[in-house]
Design a protein with these regions (language model features):
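Terminal amphipathic alpha-helical/low-complexity segments used for targeting or macromolecular assembly
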Residues: 1-115
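Structural signal for interior beta-strand "rungs" in well-ordered beta-sheet cores
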Residues: 120-231
Length: 232
């Protein structure tokens, strides 16, 4: 037990050092101007506090990720055990990267969250924006081609299959014909929803609790709780 606590402490210190370095780099990139010594000191202090807040959240993140593993295992009869899910399933890699990135984004860390999710995107073919809000017991089966947009909101016990897109419709433009940033433009997926392969759900619509969306469907309007939307 003492050895475990010792090694945990050592690794936590190493993690803190890495986090501070990376968060500082992100903050410097965001400012993109010359810095005085006092600016750099404040930036360093900010990076250290964000690193502390992130590390403090790790036990809760581990708990949430364990629910995702459980959902993947329970939903896939081919899974022999949870260790197989953790080590072999690309969706777990993508979800893990997302949950790390999302917390960093909540802490106002620039750039780094997007890098983390794009690493998983390039490795798994699963594109989850760090700005999305995703509940517990989240499962993605197979996963290749899944896209989850920045303002998507996903409840608990939701399952997606490969090729699902939670995207936006046409963007409203400002007076200079540039897309207006920061508006909610992606779907809300309530608890216990299943969305089958290659379904495309666009715009700020709501897919109600317990609904089932069949494969290869294009959805741009609200779906009532418990509704089954399938091709004829």
């Amino acid at each position: 037990k003492e050895n475990l606590l010792y090694h945990t402490g050592i690794n936590t210190e190493k993690l803190f050092e890495v986090l501070v370095k990376q968060i500082s780099a992100g903050l410097l990139f965001q400012k993109n101007t010359d810095h005085t010594d006092s600016d750099l000191k404040r930036l360093q202090e900010s990076a250290e506090q964000k690193a502390i807040d992130f590390i403090t959240f790790l036990p809760e993140m581990r708990r949430i990720l364990s629910t995702d593993v459980t959902a993947m295992y329970n939903g896939d009869p081919a899974a022999q055990n949870k260790a197989e899910v953790i080590l072999c399933y690309p969706a777990i890699r993508a979800i893990c990267n997302y949950r790390i990135a999302h917390k960093l984004l909540e802490l106002d860390v620039p750039l780094i969250p997007r890098i983390i999710t794009e690493m998983a995107h390039s490795e798994t073919g699963i594109d989850i924006h760090p700005g999305a809000v995703i509940g517990e017991y989240f499962a993605i089966d197979h996963g290749t081609g899944v896209v989850i947009g920045a303002t998507s909101v996903i409840g608990n016990r939701v399952k997606l299959y490969q090729g699902v897109t939670l995207g936006a419709r046409s963007f409203p433009l400002d007076e200079n014909n540039n897309p207006i940033k920061g508006i909610a433009r992606h779907p809300i997926i309530e608890d216990d929803v299943i969305i089958y392969s290659n379904a495309t759900i666009l715009g700020r619509i709501t897919i109600g609790k317990g609904a089932v969306i069949g494969g290869n469907i294009w959805v741009t309007e609200n779906v009532a709780p418990g509704e089954r939307l399938v091709q004829a």
